[in-house]
């Protein structure tokens, strides 16, 4: 039986114990802060990256893993003749998935590369489900089919307390940013079809609370498989959201600090709600 190994990138927000238990390989992106390059793998300590970003003169810059790194990792993982499934963040956020494809073409490994259309814990949903099926001995076709199902039943919502980082990082248009006067604006967006689509914006904390109330109303009519909550900065609002949402899903909600790659673009006091519905 051919063993299938699962690879993803460090934009995924996931519990370390799951990575170990499911034998997931995470390829780190890098972050440059005031001309010093850090591997994302070295910035996982709670609050460490946020402090570096607050102290930096310029907005940090993220870089995808080099093609050669992917090629080496793929080559190493296939030494026993197994197959590899690499699931990465949306191409709209980073060139990582394309670097993985190029790395696969340079290696002798049997690699299938998938664009998750998401990032953070929404990427985790696909990666974890794929890894579970791989451990059960399912073939590539069955795993890919299930990953597609998970993708099609996932929603990613992100709330930011400033649009400055998203605009500077080129992740939303400058026009949108200027109309919102950049600072002190709270916005909730949905990632859909590889785009961040604005849903609501306003100046006070009520912006987030009103939107959450509307989300909860919609959840009561749907079968929720799992929910993840990620945050940057204080986790107070994340915990408050968990208390409000836990009644709508059987599985415990994961509340995790998002990594440096996402924090670079969202800034401080941002959050995300990631929802996977039953097929």
Curated annotation (Swiss-Prot):
What GO terms are given for molecular function?
A: lipid binding
Tell me where the transmembrane regions lie. Answer: none
Keyword entries, A-Z: Lipid-binding
Q: Which domain of life is it from?
A: Bacteria
Q: Per its UniProt record, what PROSITE patterns does this chain match?
A: DEGV (PS51482)
Binding of hexadecanoate, residues: 62, 94
Q: Indicate whether Hydrolase appears among the record's keywords.
A: no
The family database entries (PANTHER family) matched by this protein are listed as: DEGV DOMAIN-CONTAINING PROTEIN DR_1986-RELATED, DEGV DOMAIN-CONTAINING PROTEIN SPR1019
Q: Tell me the function of this protein.
A: May bind long-chain fatty acids, such as palmitate, and may play a role in lipid transport or fatty acid metabolism.
What name is this protein filed under? DegV domain-containing protein SP_1112
């Amino acid at each position: 039986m051919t063993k299938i190994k699962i690879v993803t990138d460090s934009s995924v927000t996931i519990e370390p114990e799951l990575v170990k238990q499911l034998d997931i390989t995470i390829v780190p992106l890098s972050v440059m802060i005031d001309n010093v390059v850090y591997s994302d793998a070295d910035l996982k300590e709670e609050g460490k990256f946020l402090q570096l970003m607050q102290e930096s003169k310029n907005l940090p810059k993220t870089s995808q893993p080099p093609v050669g790194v992917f090629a080496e990792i793929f080559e190493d993982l296939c030494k026993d003749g197994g197959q590899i499934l690499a699931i990465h963040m949306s191409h709209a956020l980073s060139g990582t998935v394309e670097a993985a494809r190029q790395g696969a073409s340079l290696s002798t490994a049997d690699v299938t590369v998938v664009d998750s259309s998401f990032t953070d814990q929404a990427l985790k949903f696909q990666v974890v489900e794929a890894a579970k099926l791989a451990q059960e001995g399912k073939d590539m076709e069955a795993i890919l089919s299930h990953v597609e199902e998970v993708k099609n039943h996932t929603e990613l919502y992100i709330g930011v307390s400033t649009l400055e980082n998203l605009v500077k990082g080129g992740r939303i248009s400058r026009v949108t940013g200027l109309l919102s006067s950049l600072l002190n604006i709270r916005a909730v967006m949905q990632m859909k079809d590889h785009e961040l689509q604005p849903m609501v914006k306003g100046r006070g904390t009520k912006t987030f609370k009103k939107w959450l109330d509307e989300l909860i109303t919609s959840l009561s009519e749907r079968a929720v498989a799992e929910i993840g909550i990620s945050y940057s900065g204080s986790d107070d609002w994340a915990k408050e959201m968990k208390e409000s949402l836990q009644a709508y899903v059987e599985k415990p909600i994961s509340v995790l600090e998002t990594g440096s790659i996402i924090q670079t673009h969202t800034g401080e006091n941002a959050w995300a709600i990631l929802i996977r519905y039953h097929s």
